[in-house]
Amino acid sequence: MAISAAQNPLYIGFDLSTQQLKGLVVNSDLKVVYLSKFDFDADSRGFPIKKGVITNEAEHEVYAPVAMWLQALDTVLDGLRQQGLDFSRVKGISGAGQQHGSVYWGDRAEDLLQNLDPSKSLEAQLSDAFSHPYSPNWQDASTQKECDEFDAYLGSQEALAQATGSKAHHRFTGPQILRFQRKYPDVYRHTQRISLVSSFLASLFLGRFAPFDISDVCGMNLWNIKQGAYDEKLLKLCAGSFGVDDLKRKLGPVYEDGGLNLGSIHRYYVDRYGFNPDCTIIPATGDNPATILALPLRPSDAMVSLGTSTTFLMSTPSYQPHPATHFFNHPTTAGLYMFMLCYKNGGLAREQIRDAVNDKLGSSDDVWANFDRTALQTPPLGQKADSDPMKMGLFFPRPEIVPNLRSGQWRFDYNPADGSLHETTAGWDQPLDEARAIIESQMLSLRLRSRGLTSSPGDGKPPQPRRVYLVGGGSKNKAIAKIAGEILGGSEGVYKLEIGDNACALGAAYKAVWALERSNGQTFEDLIGQRWKEEDFIEKIADGYQPGVFEKYGQAVEGFEKMELQVLQQEKK
């Protein structure tokens, strides 16, 4: 049966995050035509959750009830139907799932998935499909012991990062599975399949187990990125006495093509909602990989998410793993990697200094006005003359992971001429000098850790991103945008990306468009780049590269690295 209105097919991207499920519908021109949401706290019935999760403080566990996600999918599909979506026009479906979370399917799962009754909801039919009713959330911190084992197993954190793209983290699926099989050996024995949240979503639409996506599998500490296969040694650690073959069966295969046709939608959705039987299911990916698909991000473009935390994402052909960073396979484009940095201290650190500045200068209607003005009036690195030392600091209201430090504040003077570094507050006009220093501190850390991943844009310019895209609350701030450009560069400038909080769902929907409309060998960046109407989504908000200033910050990066090492050594003592 051909897609009705074949000239106007529609595509759905689902985003299953910690606090809500979204279903977003786009057409071939990438225009959003429908959006349906289910907020777990506001809309779910019968689950003792707060902010989408259940917390067991005693064991540092944070997890979500999987049946709640079934309830959410039932409701989101009903919402799209009520809005008037003609499901027969939907040609493809993909999704984005919160990364690292695992779902444990029981013995009867595949049978239940295959034999869904269209007169009943998913929640009514699949609540018993799981050997374990909960999925660990990325905020879970119960696996310190297992992380230590993973970090040691190949010899060092560096070796684990080299193999899998990341050192061990509490939230990563490998350490989580290791703890799970030790804590619940009987449940693990009766687990037929382990899905990631992304492949769980795809499985629901297929009516059978969907494979992991080539990018999301990199968030497990089990996939050897360079070999393009599971790491046999790490599987051995993770499987324990149950054995590697059993774990491999539970994990299932992984395919290279992010646009793979996994098969047609299950009959259940055809009969219940009127989907076309030819509607194709495309592998769902993780929420971070989906974010870089929300625009045609070119290799060496950088995306900085300035929310409560700071996340830095980049598409790069260079694989240079380090324990402080993350590398994943790119979700659509072979030969590219997604580079990611996550910081706990983002907006909170800036707001603390903003409030101190307002206390000193008096507050106005615009709470950021004093902060912005002060930051822009302060010369780069607080240097009134080139012979003055550079002022730099670390400002962590909460413990940080990059670098691994307690909460605190440290201020230094750095002299690039002789490389000397002194911890001091002398010469600092507190808190006014800190308005610029906090932005510089956050951006210098990004520049330090993304060194070697960019190339020269030509014209004799130093290596830097082509464009820097800012998203999230901090992107509205003029001082942050200007200073970000001065430090990170951006041969074409700094842009504000306006896609609200729908980036993951958009990226998933675009992935479905690309998978089903690409010509032979056409890349995601090429197809989406041709159709993406730049003026609808982005606005240039600052210059990027500025000769002289960029190079001065290049010198500052050396001092910044020394400062971090010195503070780390002091804290060890």
Curated annotation (Swiss-Prot):
Residue numbers binding ATP: 368, 473-474, 477
Location in the cell: Cytoplasm
A Pfam family annotated for this UniProt entry: FGGY_C
Keywords, in A-Z order: ATP-binding, Carbohydrate metabolism, Cytoplasm, Kinase, Nucleotide-binding, Transferase, Xylose metabolism
Listed GO CC annotations: cytosol
This enzyme's EC code(s): 2.7.1.17
Principal location: cytoplasm
Stored InterPro entries: ATPase_NBD, D-XK_euk, FGGY_C, FGGY_N
GO function terms (MF aspect): ATP binding; D-xylulokinase activity
Catalytic activity from the UniProt record: D-xylulose + ATP = D-xylulose 5-phosphate + ADP + H(+)
SUPFAM superfamilies: Actin-like ATPase domain
Record-annotated disulphide pairs: none
Keyword match Transferase: yes
Functional summary from the UniProt entry: Highly specific D-xylulose kinase which participates in the catabolism of xylose. Xylose is a major component of hemicelluloses such as xylan. Most fungi utilize D-xylose via three enzymatic reactions, xylose reductase (XR), xylitol dehydrogenase (XDH), and xylulokinase, to form xylulose 5-phosphate, which enters pentose phosphate pathway.
Family according to the record: Belongs to the FGGY kinase family.
Name this polypeptide is given: Probable D-xylulose kinase A
Organism: Aspergillus terreus (strain NIH 2624 / FGSC A1156)
